């Protein structure tokens, strides 16, 4: 079976539905626009999600979802990565 996979990455402006661990016996669903990553403390990272209208009064608010509680991510609307990849350019100092 020959399957081709393209590189997938979380891109700012894309819309995702994230299912994560919530309270003891409950899963938490977060749906909205991905705004980026944030460092939480010293060694933890989270996703910044602007909540959509499905969250009622919380719509427009930012939710931080720690990476270690994420179970799955559904890609609802993917945007292309418009940021320039600096790692492909040679960086040096001339002075």
Language-model segments: which ranges?
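Conserved RNA-binding domains used in RNP assembly and mRNA/RNA metabolism
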Residues: 2-95
